[in-house]
């Protein structure tokens, strides 16, 4: 998932259980990834840095960039 300066791309991702998802900061600003439910959270990621999470259980996971979430930088992963 690309972390751009104001959004995640794609914003919604559907995957099978057992998938490793990687976010890559492709923007020019610092970003982070944090699940609403607290199940995962990255450190601050500088441009070019990445963060990965294995999704082993079915469910819907909402997440946000703690720096730009109020500007709409939010996403969703649906695991089946």
Language-model segment annotations:
Residues 1-80:
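Extracytoplasmic copper-binding redox domains, predominantly the cupredoxin/blue-copper superfamily
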């Amino acid at each position: 998932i690309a972390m751009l300066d104001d959004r995640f791309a794609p914003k919604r991702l559907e995957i099978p259980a057992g998938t490793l998802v990687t976010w890559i900061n492709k923007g020019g600003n610092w970003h982070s990834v944090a699940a609403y439910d607290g199940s995962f959270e990255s450190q601050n990621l500088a441009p070019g840095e990445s963060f990965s999470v294995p999704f082993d259980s079915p469910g819907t996971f909402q997440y946000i960039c703690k720096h730009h979430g109020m500007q709409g930088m939010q996403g969703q992963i649906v695991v089946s």
